[in-house]
Amino acid sequence: MDAATNVKDVITVKQGLAGRLRLNRPRALHSLNRQMVRDMANALIEWRDDPDVRIILIDHTEGRGFCAGGDVVGISQDVDGHEAAARAFFFDEYRLNHLEYTYAKPGVAFMDGITMGGGVGIACPCRYRVATERTILAMPETTIGIFPDVGAGRYLSRLRGRLAQFLALTGARLDGAECLRLRLATHYLPSDRLEEAKERIIAQPFRTQAVLDELSEEFIPEARIMGNLAKIDRYFESDRLEDILDGLDAGAADGDDWARAEAATIRAKSPMACKVTLKLLVESPYQLHFVDEMRMEFGIMVRLIHHPDFKEGVRALLIDKDNQPQWRPTNPQVIGDRDVEAFFAPLPVEEQWRPFDF
């Protein structure tokens, strides 16, 4: 709730034959807080058996972002004084992600603008994911000392080649055309056609696929990332951070400016978070169901938010904004396999994440 205006941060409303989830926190780029994820989950639960709701639409009310992720500044502050609140945010957020993933009614996410972190988490479970010329999608969590969560281990590890490792380590930003080509989006619409698409879907949800097909852009811009696939597969072949950096350094020494830039990007991230991320991408394909993925991610997250890199990353990027994080440790070589594996140990049964029990 915005105390100044008494306006809710997410608007949940039935309209026509649709249930609408409208993110409404523009001054924070619609970043998610605990009340928002609880409100969205409660609405979805209410609409599960409502015959008047045939489809779910997820979008934002105004501004340049669909959803910039979770409210990590608030979470980092909670870790010190209200640790239970920090855990509760991820517990509830992952419940929303799982509820969407298993929801019987189709969903449409309009990823118009910045779509990062938690924004990816509420968009990717939807059957229809609409990108535009304004879409900027990324999972930049290693910048703040954590890892791509909200089911990203599952979504990223299903991409071709070594794209998962590249995107997760670097936090590289994808535009709408790249999202479409990589199948993170199902459709690419000009932003000036979105309102027409929503109106037609609300009126005739059974024609959602046809409506999006009819309004899709005929001429899609080039997906620039496709030109770097061979380099991504070569340089990011290993599951060891040290090997990846050594390979990029060797490429840079041979005059590859792309390799030089990506090596510098990764070295600016938390070494611990990067190593945990690579381990996640190894383990995620072995999680048979989405519930298993979310349970694993919760166990990792509730430990990693207590590592000093999380608070330091949030400070450097979002509070002081000096972009000079002091990681602990700074050298990935001193982080052993056992250090990383400790984050993946199962939590005690009473502390484990659980989905909604219907």
Regions found by a protein language model. Name each.
Residues 151-208:
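Contiguous mid-protein beta-loop-alpha structural module that forms a pocket-lining wall or clamp
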Residues 100-144, 166-172, 176, 187:
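Glycine-rich beta-to-alpha active-site loop
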Residues 60-95, 143-145:
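Glycine- (often His-adjacent) and acidic-residue-rich active-site loop
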Residues 58, 71, 122-123, 178-179, ...:
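Hydrophobic/aromatic residues within transmembrane alpha-helices
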Residues 189-269:
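Amphipathic alpha-helical blocks and their helix-capping loop/short-beta junctions
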Residues 1-59, 98, 356-358:
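Conserved CoA-thioester-binding segment of acyl-CoA-metabolizing enzymes
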Residues 300, 308, 312-358:
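C-terminal amphipathic alpha-helical interaction region
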Residues 245-251, 258-299, 305, 309-311:
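Substrate-recognition/cap regions that form aromatic- and gly/pro-loop-enriched pockets
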